[in-house]
């Protein structure tokens, strides 16, 4: 029978899949190679034509002037900075010199004073009088000129000072004195015949708190003291480590600090929980020993009585059963033990198959027909029942399935055969009955389930039917809840004879049988695992090689983990070690495979240099603000963590809706209102709806109740900040990618420099990179990356208006009118702002306002939130449309125009203004729907012609 959990695949299918994958890879590589070669060829052609270097001489001169101005400004700024620095240093130097001079003068005056005092001669009165005059003169002059402040003459050494420690010690001494005084008063009030022992000898009158502390200690151990919880936590941490491909120590360190800390807690909990139970278990073991001899004798008597009853039945007179009885008498326990160890490997089943009676084949066919409805695949229910049996440990039932391999009919019907203890191993047989259902239920599960029922000899493919019938019978027996019973088989004819004497429960484990049982269990479990993990019966060395090379899937890893848990529950150390070795080998193979993939990816991809970027969010009005750093540690993800409910009502009144209502003030609410958008509200709505959708039980009767209940659940710590950071990262990456490929940024490599006509300080004038709508079609573009006119600074807007006036004058000289268009759609894409100028004849220019107003009124949604047409005759677009809204604007020459706030961007085309102009000028639709590219020569002619028109009206030269 095929091994459970192993998928087979032919070599041809593997080879074909590899071949198709190889062909697909080659196809992708060839396509990328062709694309790369095409781009390189196009670049070479552009370079050969001079497309990447050619530009107007005036533009080149202007760029040189800008570069010189920049260098001059830089040099000037450096010079000013240097001058300021030198000036500051000079001031410092002068101050220092002045200070040194003052110090030197003071020192010299003191020195001179000292020298003058030493030079006095106490010889005559005349000298004394002369000596007194110079002393009085400088003192009086210094007193008059340099009168010192009071704090300068204050004697700080004479001031009394106290430290903090002294003050603290003084306060403690005062408190101690008060305490002693109160105690003396209490002692004075006591009588010499006081009976309270806790108050008599200076006590407080109350007993010590030892009893309360011991009570607390005793109450600390509830049930198992948290041992099961810690073990369950350890199992979940192992599952999380397997799921996230991390080491177990790191997962344990996240929750408990370190593995040593967790083991310490577990040991303390086990000592607290099981320390007092060990003595009880020893006493219970001594009581169980007294019952063993009675159970053994009682079981032997029951078996002999059952055998005597069996001899009276007529089924033993059948030839088929005589052969089975002969095998039981002749071979005995020694032959069965030898078969259990190695008989099935040498093929002894073939020798015994010759001893079958002539009726065996007929009985086998009949049993297969009767059991055809019960041919089921052995499921994991057998393993579960076996696990319970090992845990409870019945010696008689656990060894019941170590049987001699007889013919397939006997194996499919022999449910009553049991192997006894190590001292008594006589086999018990059941009478085969015609009713297969009674035969299936005759073998009942006891308090310990029949663990070794599936530990059978591997059979060939022609015996699959018998194997499946045996699996069905054992599944039926393992699902039973009755105690294990040796019952007498019944006949269909014997209605009055019920089940024979049922035997007692076998829940207690006999100490004399435990070593033998454990040995049988470990060997049988190992045989079962080998039969499940191998596809054919092969040697153990080939199995180990296959396991080392095998890379298990997640589902197979989960099943293997379940087997490990079952082995831990059963206490089967040998099987547990083997399964753990398999798990470690599978993990190592998986990690090795992941490392190989990472190395291949690193080798294929070029090294990316890391750079620090300031993360910021942009509000709908275009203002940007940096993202705050995490204020608290983010809780780990993974696992099943139930969200905690917050307290929303107090005394029947609602006090909060969300978990962070207490930490939000008015300023924070205003900030959120200004900085959040409708998309943020929609995202919050969808998150709350997704978690509560489908759960309308309990308090959630309506949709509103669902949202209220979801809002009252506490979110994971730091989750909102993590969400803001992820959004900021996405916006930064999107903006960086857009600016890198922007064809209008002045410092971008995608900018067609040969189409530039004039360059100002903040704005430049260029021609479109495709076929123009009309001759003279041009673009006014900001130098820096700005997305809309509503977010421009005053100096940029002023320079755009300067270019606009110059273009109007230029086209007026040619008796032409002009229309200025701007379309700002999808603010998230951060498209560069383009202000287009399209010339047209004057008679059409006079009719243009009518065309545009009618088209705007009929465009977009029928029911709009904003005004359909916004008049720009008395104000510009920056004052008429709020920042952050998508809009379309049109201006007619130097007059005002119209603006329209776009309600539905899917219905509003990006070529709306060009389409109206194309209809007025009767142009073909491909001019504005999908613009036609021009070659370099046509573009150069167009640029030279427009430069001649622009030269007399160049506002950049007059401005410079």
From Swiss-Prot:
Biased composition (Polar residues): 507-518
UniProt region (Disordered), positions on chain: 1-222, 261-552, 624-648, 712-731
Keyword Coiled coil: yes
Compositional bias (Basic residues): 73-96
Start-end of Low complexity biased regions: 135-146
Gene3D superfamilies named in the record: HIT-like (3.30.428.10)
ATP-binding keyword on record: no
Ranges of biased composition (kind: Acidic residues): 108-117, 541-552
GO BP annotations listed: mRNA splicing, via spliceosome
Biased composition (Basic and acidic residues): 16-52, 165-181, 261-372, 404-417, 713-731
Coiled coil location: 13-101, 163-279, 540-605
Key words, A-Z: Coiled coil
InterPro entries in the cross-refs: Cwf19-like, Cwf19-like_C_dom-1, Cwf19-like_C_dom-2, HIT-like_sf
GO cellular component, one term: post-mRNA release spliceosomal complex
Family per similarity comment: Belongs to the CWF19 family.
UniProt xrefs under PANTHER family: CWF19, CELL CYCLE CONTROL PROTEIN, CWF19-LIKE PROTEIN 2
Protein name: CWF19-like protein 2
Biological source species: Danio rerio
